[in-house]
Amino acid sequence: MCLGGENYLELTELIFIVVAVVVSLFVGGFIGWLIRKSAAEKLIGSAEEEAKRVIDNAQGAAEAKRREAVIAAKEEVMHIRNEVEKESRERRNEIQRMERRVIQKEESLDRKMESLERKEDNLHRKEEEVDQLKEVLTQTVAKEKQELERVSGLSTEEAKQILLQSVEEEVRYESAIMIKDIETKAKEEAEKRAKNIISLAIQRCAADHVAESTVSVVALPSDEMKGRIIGREGRNIRTLETLTGIDLIIDDTPEAVILSGFDPIRREVARVALEKLIADGRIHPARIEEMVEKSQKEVDQRIREEGEQATFETGVHGLHPEIIRLLGRLKFRTSYGQNVLKHSMEVSHLAGLMAAELGVDVQLAKRAGLLHDLGKAVDHDTEGTHVQIGVDLAKKYKESWEVIHAIEAHHGDVEAKTIEAVLVAAADAVSAARPGARRETLESYIKRLQKLEEIADTYDGVEKSYAIQAGREIRIIVRPDKIDDVLAPKVAREISKRIEDELEYPGQIKVVVIRETRAVDYAK
């Protein structure tokens, strides 16, 4: 029982302690809560005061900002209002100015309308007056026409024909004057430019020509050689003539034998062969045949060398070998006494120089100029003109169309379509017409002069004509009562056309029409 009582006391003390501890904790917590509550109330109070102070400050600043914003807004509104009022005033002023201008224009239009109305009224009145005058004039003209027909004895149609004829003559006269002026200006300009180009080309081209004949002279060491050349019963001379086709003329000319023939190549072969025979001294038919054969080969070689030299001097390259050989043959060909190869080379140089002045193809012009008389190398052996033969040869050896065209156009057989063809024709005429370049037989020369004068004398109004300057100029004296100064150029042009159509001549012929009026009286 004692043990149980002690446990009970311990339990009671333990409970008491626990209760005391719990009560202490509760009391301590309550006191702490009171302390924290008091501190919190103090903190809240100070925070409220601070918040109030901040709010008061913020409200003051906001009020100040608001007042500033209100002031700024009022100022902006005032500024905008001033701008709007200023713009409005300007617009009103502009509208007022426009209104004044519109009013002025309306007033001006009104005045113009009134003026137009007055003019229209005047026009109507004048139209009425004109109609009345027309009617009166028509009646007057009809009366005058009847009176004129009665007085003149001519009908209206007859008078009209006379008037038309008079007007036609007047128009023809005026047109002739205009044509004369235009032709004069065009000819002056064309002649000036052509003379300039041709003179420059001629000045830069120096060429010499030797007028060759149909005979060659071979010098002999002595007159005894003539008998050896003739041979027994003339067999040597017959053999040489048979082999070469050349006539040997042995006359009284001392120490010389003449070779005559129209083929220059055969004549050259005969000359070379005869010189070899004379130098060798052995002259008999077999030796003659041998020397003629050697001479033929030498002349053929010389022909080729002459052709090559011509191409070298003119600067024309790429020719077919056969064309080069044909060019060499031209060395022994003459036309009116002018060496054809020298003439072709001169034409090549002139055409090239004129082409350079005009800025066209110089090489093409020189090539066409060199080959323009190629047909003369074989025209003795082939039918046809030298122009057609030259065209055929150029086609055969694949020359260009431009070169072929220049060959066929250089004598005017066809119309020149390229400037190179024109230049070749001009160069050919310049080379042929140069004083001393060519010569004609006396008979053909006289016939040409007579034909020139005959053509001029057949023209109506021509009194007399004279061919001068070796047939390169014809002066025609006309009757002043038949041909006036205006028609004189027409006469010259028509006679020039007839000369071109009916005559063949190298170069050009100047046609001069002379009209002279003389007034003669006698003092008594």
From Swiss-Prot:
Keywords: Cell membrane, Endonuclease, Hydrolase, Membrane, Nuclease, RNA-binding, Transmembrane, Transmembrane helix. Gene3D superfamilies: Hypothetical protein af1432, K Homology domain, type 1. Residues 214-277 form the KH domain. It is found in: Cell membrane. Its EC number is 3.1.-.-. Residues 340-433 form the HD domain. InterPro entries: HD/PDEase_dom, HD_domain, HDIG_dom, KH_dom, KH_dom_type_1, KH_dom_type_1_sf, Ribonuclease_Y, RNase_Y_N. PROSITE patterns: HD, KH_TYPE_1. Endoribonuclease that initiates mRNA decay. This is Ribonuclease Y.
